[in-house]
Amino acid sequence: MKELIKDPLNLIIIGVAGQGNVVTSQLVCDALVREGYLVTFGQSYPAQQRGGSVINYIRISKEIQCSPIIPEGRADVIVAMEPVEAIRMLAQFGNPDVITMVNPRPIQAIDITGSKAKYPGLNKVMEDIKDLSAKTWVINATEEAQELGNAIMANVILVGALVGCGLLPLERKSLEPVIEERFPRAFELNMAAFDRGVELAREQE
């Protein structure tokens, strides 16, 4: 069995509503529990966004049951399905050792869309993410999912990438039953998305 890179491991998964980040979190949690890990899951909703995004907190350990909310400045891994959301999480939960995985497809959340503020330049956002992270994995999950036939599978691609780069102590066989239960009529397609995520992560090693 693979080992945690840190115990407990504090993982944050964030995205704009509709990107499937809650499903991403559920797949990760279910697979970890099946492998015998103690997993605590929590959520919060940024007030300024009025439903624009949801923060998913996942705390993983072999030894202890953690509280559901990750303290500020204590994230070990941040997975952002949208670049500006990565910056927000790094500002609040980042530290010199934090690892970030980001899908570089920008989506304007409610607070940006509803105001006069423009979405910041993507190149600058990506540079800032790298500057604020000890290690950054850029996974073009939306683009790859579209090539597979459905952009919503970006969430499964990111799960595959987390496994592929070794940030989660899981293997393909850990996710197969979880993905089959969640997507029984699209199991093979979602496993293809998972496998593509693994490949994308390993290409950056």
Model-predicted segments: where are they?
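Active-site cofactor/cluster-binding pocket
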Residues: M1-E205
